[in-house]
Amino acid sequence: MAGHSKWANIQHRKGRQDEKRGKVWTRIIREITVAARAGGADLGTNPRLRLAVERAKAANMPADRIKYNIDKASGTLEGVQYEEIRYEGYGIGGAAILVDTMTDNKVRTVAEVRHAFAKFGGNMGAEGSVAFQFKHCGQLIFAPGTNEDKVMEVALESGAEDVITDDDGAIEVLTAYPDFEAVKNALEAAGLKPEAADVTMRAENPIELTGDDAVRMQKLLDALEDLDDVQEIYHNAEIDAEAL
C-alpha cells in the first residue's frame, strides 16, 4: 500500500531533538515518572515504563539516571507530581493538532499552549474537537532502502495491521496498540531495526500543505515543540519537505 512521505518530517524532528538533548531528557524523565507511578517500577509488568526506558536508552541517558528516576517515581524517593493533559486545536489550513503535556502547573501550561497557537496562526479547540480524527496505534518507520518484502512478511505474520510504503521509499508498519511490542520484537529479531518506533496518535485523514502554508504550519509545530511542558505533538498535516 502506498502512502505519503513521513521521512523528511522524522529527520527534521530528530535534528531538532539532537540539538536539544537536555530537553529531550527532561521529557523522557517526565514520562518515566508518570509511567512508574501509574503502573509500578517493574519493567516486566509495565509496558508504558518499558517503552519510556527504551526511549531513554535511545537518547543515551545513563543507566543510573534512568534507575534514579524510576525509584523516585515509584516512591523510593520524593519527587514532583505531574498531571497529564491533552490540548486540541487547529493549525494552518484547518489542520488538526493534538498536544500532549505533562505539567506541575496546568494554568501555566494552558496559557503557553494557547499563546503558541495564537502567535503562529492556529487556534485552540474544545476537548473532542479534533481527537476523533486520530487513531491510537503502534507505528514503526523503516528507512528508505529497507527490504520491503521482508518487513511486510515479518510484520504481518507477527500481527501488524498494515504495511505502507511512503512516496520516498520509507516503510511504515501499523499495529493495534496491544500488539505493538510483539510486532516490534519480531521485526528486530529478524534483523529489521526501525528508525522510529512508538505508540502514537495517527491521523486518519491527512491534508497536504505546500508553500507558505507549509512553512507557517512548521513554525507553529516547532513553537509548540519548544514549550517545556509539551511531551508529544500529533497532527494531520503532510508538510512539503521544502518547508522543513
Swiss-Prot record:
GO molecular function (one): DNA binding
Which BP terms does GO give this entry?
A: regulation of DNA-templated transcription
Q: Would you say which domain of life the source belongs to?
A: Bacteria
Q: Which organism is it from?
A: Albidiferax ferrireducens (strain ATCC BAA-621 / DSM 15236 / T118) (Rhodoferax ferrireducens)
Which InterPro entries does the UniProt entry name for this protein? Integrase-like_N, TACO1_YebC-like_2nd/3rd_dom, TACO1_YebC_N, Transcrip_reg_TACO1-like, Transcrip_reg_TACO1-like_dom3, YebC-like
Keyword annotations for this protein, in alphabetical order, are: Cytoplasm, DNA-binding, Transcription, Transcription regulation
PANTHER family listed in its UniProt record: TRANSCRIPTIONAL REGULATORY PROTEIN YEBC-RELATED, TRANSLATIONAL ACTIVATOR OF CYTOCHROME C OXIDASE 1
List, alphabetically, the Pfam families matched: TACO1_YebC_N (PF20772), Transcrip_reg (PF01709)
Protein name, please? Answer: Probable transcriptional regulatory protein Rfer_2075
Q: Which family does it belong to?
A: Belongs to the TACO1 family.
Q: Which GO terms describe its cellular component?
A: cytosol
Q: Where in the cell is it found?
A: Cytoplasm
Q: Which cysteines are joined by disulfide bonds?
A: none
